[in-house]
Protein backbone atom coordinates (compact mmCIF):
# COMPACT_ATOMS: atom_id res chain seq x y z
CA UNK A 1 0.00 0.00 0.00
CA UNK A 2 2.77 2.47 0.93
CA UNK A 3 4.62 1.75 -2.32
CA UNK A 4 1.44 2.18 -4.38
CA UNK A 5 0.65 5.52 -2.77
CA UNK A 6 4.23 6.55 -3.34
CA UNK A 7 3.92 5.83 -7.05
CA UNK A 8 0.72 7.85 -7.21
CA UNK A 9 2.35 10.80 -5.50
CA UNK A 10 5.36 10.55 -7.79
CA UNK A 11 3.27 11.32 -10.86
CA UNK A 12 1.02 13.90 -9.17
CA UNK A 13 1.77 17.46 -10.31
CA UNK A 14 3.49 19.67 -7.74
CA UNK A 15 1.65 22.73 -9.05
CA UNK A 16 -2.12 23.22 -9.15
CA UNK A 17 -3.73 22.50 -12.51
CA UNK A 18 -6.51 24.38 -14.22
CA UNK A 19 -5.66 27.83 -12.85
CA UNK A 20 -3.29 30.00 -14.92
CA UNK A 21 0.08 30.14 -13.19
CA UNK A 22 0.12 33.94 -13.15
CA UNK A 23 -3.14 34.02 -11.18
CA UNK A 24 -1.40 32.95 -7.97
CA UNK A 25 1.04 35.89 -7.76
CA UNK A 26 -1.89 38.17 -8.61
CA UNK A 27 -3.78 36.79 -5.61
CA UNK A 28 -0.79 37.38 -3.37
CA UNK A 29 -0.41 40.92 -4.69
CA UNK A 30 -4.04 41.61 -3.84
CA UNK A 31 -3.55 40.23 -0.34
CA UNK A 32 -0.44 42.35 0.22
CA UNK A 33 -2.53 45.51 -0.26
CA UNK A 34 -4.21 44.87 3.10
CA UNK A 35 -1.27 43.23 4.87
CA UNK A 36 0.16 45.32 7.71
CA UNK A 37 2.44 42.67 9.13
CA UNK A 38 4.04 39.29 8.46
CA UNK A 39 1.84 36.47 7.18
CA UNK A 40 2.98 32.89 7.76
CA UNK A 41 1.18 29.88 6.28
CA UNK A 42 2.22 26.26 6.53
CA UNK A 43 1.37 23.59 3.97
CA UNK A 44 -0.62 20.65 5.28
CA UNK A 45 1.49 17.94 6.90
CA UNK A 46 2.13 14.78 4.91
CA UNK A 47 0.21 11.56 5.59
CA UNK A 48 1.72 8.68 3.65
CA UNK A 49 -1.31 6.44 4.14
CA UNK A 50 -3.89 8.86 2.75
CA UNK A 51 -4.37 10.88 -0.41
CA UNK A 52 -2.60 14.18 0.20
CA UNK A 53 -4.86 17.22 -0.07
CA UNK A 54 -3.22 20.61 0.37
CA UNK A 55 -4.45 23.12 2.96
CA UNK A 56 -6.91 25.28 0.96
CA UNK A 57 -5.64 28.75 1.92
CA UNK A 58 -2.06 27.72 1.20
CA UNK A 59 -3.12 26.25 -2.14
CA UNK A 60 -5.14 29.36 -3.03
CA UNK A 61 -2.15 31.67 -2.58
CA UNK A 62 0.62 29.44 -3.93
CA UNK A 63 -0.84 26.73 -6.17
CA UNK A 64 1.65 24.44 -4.46
CA UNK A 65 0.42 20.88 -3.82
CA UNK A 66 3.37 19.32 -2.00
CA UNK A 67 3.73 19.00 1.79
CA UNK A 68 6.40 20.61 3.92
CA UNK A 69 6.35 24.08 2.35
CA UNK A 70 5.95 27.41 4.16
CA UNK A 71 4.76 30.77 2.81
CA UNK A 72 5.95 34.03 4.38
CA UNK A 73 4.70 37.41 3.17
CA UNK A 74 4.80 41.10 3.99
CA UNK A 75 3.47 44.05 2.03
CA UNK A 76 6.74 44.09 0.08
CA UNK A 77 8.09 40.54 0.11
CA UNK A 78 6.92 36.99 -0.52
CA UNK A 79 9.06 33.94 0.15
CA UNK A 80 8.40 30.23 -0.32
CA UNK A 81 10.36 27.86 1.91
CA UNK A 82 10.83 24.27 0.74
CA UNK A 83 12.25 21.24 2.56
CA UNK A 84 15.48 19.73 1.23
CA UNK A 85 15.37 16.61 -0.89
CA UNK A 86 15.12 13.36 1.05
CA UNK A 87 16.65 10.55 -1.01
CA UNK A 88 15.07 7.82 1.10
CA UNK A 89 11.60 9.37 0.91
CA UNK A 90 11.96 9.74 -2.86
CA UNK A 91 12.10 5.94 -3.17
CA UNK A 92 8.51 5.90 -1.88
CA UNK A 93 7.11 9.17 -3.17
CA UNK A 94 9.10 10.22 -6.18
CA UNK A 95 11.40 13.14 -6.90
CA UNK A 96 10.66 16.29 -4.92
CA UNK A 97 11.70 19.82 -5.80
CA UNK A 98 14.69 21.12 -3.88
CA UNK A 99 15.01 24.82 -2.99
CA UNK A 100 18.44 24.77 -4.66
CA UNK A 101 17.23 23.36 -8.00
CA UNK A 102 18.19 25.57 -10.93
CA UNK A 103 14.59 25.74 -12.18
CA UNK A 104 12.92 26.17 -8.78
CA UNK A 105 11.74 29.71 -9.58
CA UNK A 106 10.06 28.59 -12.80
CA UNK A 107 8.42 25.62 -11.09
CA UNK A 108 7.09 27.50 -8.07
CA UNK A 109 6.25 30.93 -9.47
CA UNK A 110 8.20 32.58 -6.62
CA UNK A 111 11.18 34.85 -7.14
CA UNK A 112 12.41 34.05 -3.63
CA UNK A 113 12.65 30.37 -2.67
CA UNK A 114 14.67 29.42 0.41
CA UNK A 115 15.36 26.22 2.35
CA UNK A 116 13.22 25.65 5.44
CA UNK A 117 16.32 26.00 7.58
CA UNK A 118 16.14 29.76 6.90
CA UNK A 119 12.64 30.23 8.33
CA UNK A 120 13.53 31.56 11.78
CA UNK A 121 16.21 34.02 10.66
CA UNK A 122 13.97 35.31 7.86
CA UNK A 123 11.01 35.65 10.23
CA UNK A 124 13.06 37.61 12.77
CA UNK A 125 14.25 39.94 10.01
CA UNK A 126 10.74 40.58 8.69
CA UNK A 127 9.09 41.26 12.05
CA UNK A 128 11.52 44.08 12.85
CA UNK A 129 9.28 46.48 10.91
CA UNK A 130 5.97 44.63 11.21
CA UNK A 131 3.40 45.32 13.96
CA UNK A 132 1.37 42.13 13.41
CA UNK A 133 1.86 38.43 12.76
CA UNK A 134 -0.85 36.83 10.64
CA UNK A 135 -1.31 33.07 10.82
CA UNK A 136 -4.04 30.47 10.94
CA UNK A 137 -4.88 30.23 14.60
CA UNK A 138 -5.11 26.44 14.68
CA UNK A 139 -1.57 25.97 13.34
CA UNK A 140 0.84 24.79 16.05
CA UNK A 141 3.85 25.43 13.79
CA UNK A 142 2.87 29.09 13.49
CA UNK A 143 2.54 29.31 17.26
CA UNK A 144 6.20 28.32 17.64
CA UNK A 145 7.25 31.19 15.38
CA UNK A 146 4.96 33.63 17.15
CA UNK A 147 6.67 32.72 20.42
CA UNK A 148 9.79 34.39 19.01
CA UNK A 149 7.90 37.70 18.95
CA UNK A 150 5.68 37.74 22.07
CA UNK A 151 5.08 41.50 21.94
CA UNK A 152 3.66 41.51 18.42
CA UNK A 153 -0.08 41.69 17.83
CA UNK A 154 -1.74 38.57 16.42
CA UNK A 155 -3.68 38.86 13.16
CA UNK A 156 -6.13 36.40 11.61
CA UNK A 157 -4.82 35.20 8.24
CA UNK A 158 -7.98 33.20 7.57
CA UNK A 159 -10.16 36.32 7.67
CA UNK A 160 -7.93 38.17 5.18
CA UNK A 161 -7.77 35.27 2.72
CA UNK A 162 -11.49 34.51 3.01
CA UNK A 163 -12.31 37.91 1.52
CA UNK A 164 -10.29 37.04 -1.57
CA UNK A 165 -11.71 33.53 -1.92
CA UNK A 166 -15.29 34.80 -1.79
CA UNK A 167 -15.25 36.06 -5.40
CA UNK A 168 -14.30 33.53 -8.07
CA UNK A 169 -12.14 34.21 -11.11
CA UNK A 170 -13.15 33.00 -14.60
CA UNK A 171 -10.67 30.11 -14.26
CA UNK A 172 -12.18 29.07 -10.92
CA UNK A 173 -15.70 29.25 -12.33
CA UNK A 174 -14.63 27.07 -15.28
CA UNK A 175 -13.35 24.39 -12.90
CA UNK A 176 -16.52 24.49 -10.81
CA UNK A 177 -18.51 24.16 -14.03
CA UNK A 178 -16.40 21.15 -15.03
CA UNK A 179 -17.06 19.52 -11.66
CA UNK A 180 -20.76 20.37 -12.01
CA UNK A 181 -21.05 18.85 -15.48
CA UNK A 182 -19.38 15.65 -14.29
CA UNK A 183 -21.67 15.52 -11.27
CA UNK A 184 -24.78 15.98 -13.42
CA UNK A 185 -23.66 12.98 -15.49
CA UNK A 186 -23.10 11.01 -12.28
CA UNK A 187 -26.60 11.72 -10.96
CA UNK A 188 -28.16 10.73 -14.28
CA UNK A 189 -26.17 7.49 -14.33
CA UNK A 190 -27.40 6.72 -10.82
CA UNK A 191 -30.99 7.40 -11.80
CA UNK A 192 -30.74 4.98 -14.70
CA UNK A 193 -29.24 2.31 -12.40
CA UNK A 194 -31.80 2.83 -9.63
CA UNK A 195 -33.99 -0.12 -8.67
CA UNK A 196 -35.55 -1.68 -5.61
CA UNK A 197 -33.29 -4.11 -3.77
CA UNK A 198 -30.03 -2.32 -4.46
CA UNK A 199 -27.95 -0.86 -1.66
CA UNK A 200 -27.20 2.80 -1.16
CA UNK A 201 -23.46 2.19 -1.53
CA UNK A 202 -24.04 0.68 -4.98
CA UNK A 203 -25.65 3.91 -6.15
CA UNK A 204 -22.82 5.92 -4.59
CA UNK A 205 -20.33 3.74 -6.47
CA UNK A 206 -22.07 4.39 -9.80
CA UNK A 207 -21.84 8.11 -9.17
CA UNK A 208 -18.19 8.26 -8.14
CA UNK A 209 -17.18 5.96 -11.01
CA UNK A 210 -18.97 8.26 -13.45
CA UNK A 211 -17.38 11.52 -12.42
CA UNK A 212 -13.95 9.94 -12.10
CA UNK A 213 -14.42 9.02 -15.75
CA UNK A 214 -15.04 12.70 -16.52
CA UNK A 215 -11.60 13.63 -15.18
CA UNK A 216 -12.51 14.52 -11.59
CA UNK A 217 -9.95 13.18 -9.15
CA UNK A 218 -12.04 12.82 -6.01
CA UNK A 219 -15.38 13.39 -4.32
CA UNK A 220 -15.86 16.90 -2.97
CA UNK A 221 -17.32 15.38 0.22
CA UNK A 222 -18.51 12.02 1.49
CA UNK A 223 -21.35 10.93 -0.83
CA UNK A 224 -24.77 10.95 0.82
CA UNK A 225 -27.26 8.38 -0.50
CA UNK A 226 -30.06 8.14 2.05
CA UNK A 227 -33.21 6.11 1.39
CA UNK A 228 -36.39 5.70 3.42
CA UNK A 229 -35.65 6.53 7.08
CA UNK A 230 -32.18 7.70 6.09
CA UNK A 231 -33.64 10.39 3.84
CA UNK A 232 -34.46 12.47 6.92
CA UNK A 233 -30.87 12.36 8.24
CA UNK A 234 -29.21 15.46 6.80
CA UNK A 235 -25.58 14.28 6.60
CA UNK A 236 -26.11 10.52 6.52
CA UNK A 237 -23.15 8.99 4.68
CA UNK A 238 -22.96 5.36 5.85
CA UNK A 239 -24.79 4.37 2.63
CA UNK A 240 -25.36 0.80 3.87
CA UNK A 241 -29.12 0.34 3.64
CA UNK A 242 -31.07 -1.73 1.13
CA UNK A 243 -33.44 0.52 -0.84
CA UNK A 244 -37.04 -0.56 -1.25
CA UNK A 245 -39.85 0.33 -3.63
CA UNK A 246 -42.10 3.12 -2.38
CA UNK A 247 -39.27 5.06 -0.77
CA UNK A 248 -37.50 8.24 -1.77
CA UNK A 249 -33.71 8.51 -1.77
CA UNK A 250 -31.80 11.74 -1.15
CA UNK A 251 -28.61 11.84 -3.23
CA UNK A 252 -26.26 14.62 -2.12
CA UNK A 253 -23.15 13.87 -4.16
CA UNK A 254 -20.61 16.18 -5.79
CA UNK A 255 -17.29 15.88 -7.59
CA UNK A 256 -14.05 17.78 -7.18
CA UNK A 257 -12.06 18.67 -10.28
CA UNK A 258 -8.57 20.20 -10.08
CA UNK A 259 -9.23 21.06 -6.42
CA UNK A 260 -12.59 22.81 -7.03
CA UNK A 261 -15.87 21.42 -5.73
CA UNK A 262 -19.51 21.41 -6.66
CA UNK A 263 -22.51 20.51 -4.50
CA UNK A 264 -25.65 18.91 -5.91
CA UNK A 265 -28.65 17.18 -4.33
CA UNK A 266 -31.64 15.51 -5.90
CA UNK A 267 -34.37 13.40 -4.32
CA UNK A 268 -35.89 10.64 -6.44
CA UNK A 269 -38.29 7.71 -5.96
CA UNK A 270 -36.57 4.32 -5.76
CA UNK A 271 -39.15 2.66 -8.01
CA UNK A 272 -39.40 5.59 -10.42
CA UNK A 273 -42.77 6.90 -9.22
CA UNK A 274 -43.50 9.32 -6.38
CA UNK A 275 -46.45 8.57 -4.12
CA UNK A 276 -49.04 11.33 -3.86
CA UNK A 277 -47.63 12.47 -0.50
CA UNK A 278 -44.01 12.29 -1.66
CA UNK A 279 -44.91 14.31 -4.73
CA UNK A 280 -46.68 16.92 -2.59
CA UNK A 281 -43.65 17.40 -0.34
CA UNK A 282 -41.27 17.38 -3.31
CA UNK A 283 -43.24 20.07 -5.15
CA UNK A 284 -43.20 22.28 -2.05
CA UNK A 285 -39.41 22.02 -1.74
CA UNK A 286 -39.01 22.67 -5.46
CA UNK A 287 -41.25 25.72 -5.22
CA UNK A 288 -39.20 27.06 -2.31
CA UNK A 289 -35.99 26.57 -4.25
CA UNK A 290 -37.37 28.31 -7.34
CA UNK A 291 -38.58 31.24 -5.23
CA UNK A 292 -35.17 31.65 -3.62
CA UNK A 293 -33.25 31.30 -6.90
CA UNK A 294 -35.49 33.92 -8.51
CA UNK A 295 -34.27 36.38 -5.86
CA UNK A 296 -30.55 35.64 -6.32
CA UNK A 297 -28.73 38.74 -7.56
CA UNK A 298 -26.08 41.17 -6.31
CA UNK A 299 -27.31 42.79 -3.11
CA UNK A 300 -29.64 39.94 -2.12
CA UNK A 301 -29.47 39.32 1.61
CA UNK A 302 -28.09 36.10 3.06
CA UNK A 303 -28.17 34.81 6.61
CA UNK A 304 -31.46 34.76 8.50
CA UNK A 305 -34.17 37.30 9.09
CA UNK A 306 -36.68 39.36 7.15
CA UNK A 307 -35.92 39.84 3.47
CA UNK A 308 -33.25 37.14 3.26
CA UNK A 309 -33.21 34.27 0.78
CA UNK A 310 -33.54 31.92 3.76
CA UNK A 311 -36.77 33.65 4.77
CA UNK A 312 -38.13 33.49 1.22
CA UNK A 313 -37.65 29.72 1.16
CA UNK A 314 -38.99 29.26 4.70
CA UNK A 315 -42.10 31.33 4.03
CA UNK A 316 -42.87 29.29 0.91
CA UNK A 317 -42.54 26.01 2.79
CA UNK A 318 -44.50 27.27 5.79
CA UNK A 319 -47.45 28.41 3.67
CA UNK A 320 -47.72 25.32 1.46
CA UNK A 321 -48.86 22.00 2.84
CA UNK A 322 -49.32 20.59 6.34
CA UNK A 323 -47.94 17.74 8.41
CA UNK A 324 -50.06 14.80 9.59
CA UNK A 325 -51.35 16.93 12.48
CA UNK A 326 -52.35 19.88 10.32
CA UNK A 327 -49.39 22.05 11.33
CA UNK A 328 -47.35 24.09 8.83
CA UNK A 329 -44.24 22.45 7.40
CA UNK A 330 -41.77 25.23 8.22
CA UNK A 331 -40.51 23.43 11.33
CA UNK A 332 -39.23 20.62 9.09
CA UNK A 333 -36.85 22.97 7.25
CA UNK A 334 -34.08 22.76 9.81
CA UNK A 335 -30.87 23.92 8.11
CA UNK A 336 -29.38 26.88 6.29
CA UNK A 337 -30.33 27.57 2.70
CA UNK A 338 -26.94 28.39 1.27
CA UNK A 339 -23.17 28.36 1.52
CA UNK A 340 -20.24 29.33 -0.67
CA UNK A 341 -18.58 26.76 -2.95
CA UNK A 342 -15.00 26.71 -4.23
CA UNK A 343 -11.80 25.01 -3.10
CA UNK A 344 -13.89 23.80 -0.16
CA UNK A 345 -17.41 22.55 -0.66
CA UNK A 346 -18.26 24.89 2.23
CA UNK A 347 -16.02 27.72 1.08
CA UNK A 348 -15.28 30.80 3.19
CA UNK A 349 -16.37 33.12 4.50
CA UNK A 350 -18.53 31.12 6.91
CA UNK A 351 -20.84 34.08 7.52
CA UNK A 352 -22.54 35.11 4.31
CA UNK A 353 -23.83 38.65 3.92
CA UNK A 354 -25.07 40.42 0.79
CA UNK A 355 -24.46 38.60 -2.48
CA UNK A 356 -21.91 39.93 -4.97
CA UNK A 357 -21.32 39.13 -8.62
CA UNK A 358 -18.68 36.42 -8.84
CA UNK A 359 -19.80 34.48 -5.78
CA UNK A 360 -20.64 30.79 -6.22
CA UNK A 361 -23.25 29.55 -3.76
CA UNK A 362 -25.75 26.77 -3.20
CA UNK A 363 -29.51 27.05 -2.83
CA UNK A 364 -30.75 23.96 -0.98
CA UNK A 365 -34.10 23.97 0.82
CA UNK A 366 -35.33 20.76 2.37
CA UNK A 367 -38.18 19.18 4.29
CA UNK A 368 -37.51 16.22 6.60
CA UNK A 369 -40.49 14.48 8.23
CA UNK A 370 -39.27 11.57 10.41
CA UNK A 371 -42.76 10.27 11.23
CA UNK A 372 -43.40 9.75 7.51
CA UNK A 373 -39.89 8.64 6.49
CA UNK A 374 -39.95 11.37 3.86
CA UNK A 375 -36.95 13.60 3.40
CA UNK A 376 -36.60 15.86 0.36
CA UNK A 377 -33.72 18.18 -0.45
CA UNK A 378 -33.04 19.89 -3.79
CA UNK A 379 -29.72 21.66 -4.21
CA UNK A 380 -27.96 23.45 -7.04
CA UNK A 381 -24.64 25.26 -7.33
CA UNK A 382 -25.20 28.79 -8.61
CA UNK A 383 -23.02 31.61 -9.92
CA UNK A 384 -24.11 35.12 -8.97
CA UNK A 385 -23.90 37.31 -12.08
CA UNK A 386 -24.12 41.07 -12.61
CA UNK A 387 -27.84 40.88 -13.36
CA UNK A 388 -28.98 37.72 -11.57
CA UNK A 389 -27.55 34.23 -11.57
CA UNK A 390 -26.57 31.19 -13.59
CA UNK A 391 -27.36 27.68 -12.34
CA UNK A 392 -24.12 25.77 -12.95
CA UNK A 393 -25.87 22.45 -12.26
CA UNK A 394 -29.01 23.39 -14.16
CA UNK A 395 -28.61 20.56 -16.69
CA UNK A 396 -29.78 18.08 -14.05
CA UNK A 397 -33.59 17.75 -14.21
CA UNK A 398 -35.68 18.41 -11.12
CA UNK A 399 -39.29 18.50 -12.31
CA UNK A 400 -41.35 15.51 -11.14
CA UNK A 401 -42.25 14.39 -14.65
CA UNK A 402 -38.64 14.51 -15.83
CA UNK A 403 -37.41 12.51 -12.86
CA UNK A 404 -40.08 9.84 -13.22
CA UNK A 405 -39.23 9.43 -16.91
CA UNK A 406 -35.55 8.84 -16.14
CA UNK A 407 -35.32 6.85 -12.89
CA UNK A 408 -34.85 3.15 -13.53
CA UNK A 409 -35.04 3.55 -17.29
Name each region found by the language model.
Residues 1-7:
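Sec-dependent signal peptide recognition
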Residues 11-13:
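N-terminal signal peptide c-region/cleavage motif recognized by signal peptidases
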Residues 15-409:
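Active-site neighborhoods and metal-handling regions in enzymes and metal-associated proteins
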Amino acid sequence: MRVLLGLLLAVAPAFSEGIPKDEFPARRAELRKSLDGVLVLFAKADDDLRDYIQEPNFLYLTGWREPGAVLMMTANEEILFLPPRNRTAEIFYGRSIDPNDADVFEKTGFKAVLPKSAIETTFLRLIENAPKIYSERTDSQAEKLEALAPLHEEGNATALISKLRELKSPAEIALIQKASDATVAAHLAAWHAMKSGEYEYQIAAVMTYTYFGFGCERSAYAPIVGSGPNSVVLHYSANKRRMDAGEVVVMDVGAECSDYATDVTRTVPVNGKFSARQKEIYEIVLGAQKAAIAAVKPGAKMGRGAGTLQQIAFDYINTHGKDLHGAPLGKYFVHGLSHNVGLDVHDPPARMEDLKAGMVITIEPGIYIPEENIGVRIEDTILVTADGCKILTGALPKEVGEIERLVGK
